[in-house]
């Protein structure tokens, strides 16, 4: 391999190593089972992610609950955003759907206020309860309600979703 190819490989390994640590740190902040995952590795040629469990063995993604897989995906996006070093707006649709109450609290307290300089949450009316709203309120600049009118077949935007 030539000098340029060697340099390219070194840069990719350095960046994947940084992403591994940021993604793992993000995942561990969101999980309620703090000892579930010991390591997260990314293959620098295929970019395939692998989890290592507390026992030191490979932890297949299908051994994670649906909520844990959702948190893993969120952690990967959070880690990538943090690794980029750029302010990237984050849009999250129905963010709390599959999660138990403890994982919901972790997202509300640890992720949403820190995910980006600008976070758009597209939530259902059931997802953000009064307790969650109070925890998020310091980070909310504006809120809107998407109001669908069946007869007109259109949706209007109204200010004050949490009013």
Q: What is each stretch, according to the model?
A:
Residues 86-87, 99-107:
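Conserved D-loop/post-Walker B switch-helix segment of ABC ATPase nucleotide-binding domains
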Residues 105-163:
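C-terminal lobe/lid and adjacent interdomain/linker elements of RecA-like ASCE P-loop ATPase modules
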Residues 64, 80-85, 111-115, 137:
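Conserved catalytic network of the ASCE P-loop NTPase/AAA+ motor domain
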Residues 1-32:
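Charged, surface-exposed helical/loop "interaction arms" that form contiguous linear patches used
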């Amino acid at each position: 391999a030539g000098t340029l190819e060697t340099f390219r490989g070194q840069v990719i390994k350095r960046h994947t190593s940084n992403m591994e640590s940021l993604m793992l740190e993000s995942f561990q902040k969101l999980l309620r089972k703090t000892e579930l995952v010991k390591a997260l590795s990314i293959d620098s040629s295929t970019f395939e992610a692998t989890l290592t469990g507390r026992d030191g063995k490979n932890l297949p993604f299908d051994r994670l609950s649906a909520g844990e897989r959702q948190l893993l995906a969120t952690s990967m996006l959070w880690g990538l955003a943090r690794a980029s070093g750029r302010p990237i707006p984050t849009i999250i649709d129905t963010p709390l759907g599959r999660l138990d109450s403890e994982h919901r609290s972790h997202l509300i307290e640890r992720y949403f206020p820190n995910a980006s300089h600008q976070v758009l949450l597209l939530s259902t009316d059931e997802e953000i309860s009064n307790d969650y709203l109070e925890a998020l309120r310091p980070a909310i600049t504006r809120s809107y309600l998407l109001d669908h009118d069946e007869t007109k077949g259109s949706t209007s935007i109204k200010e004050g979703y949490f009013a």
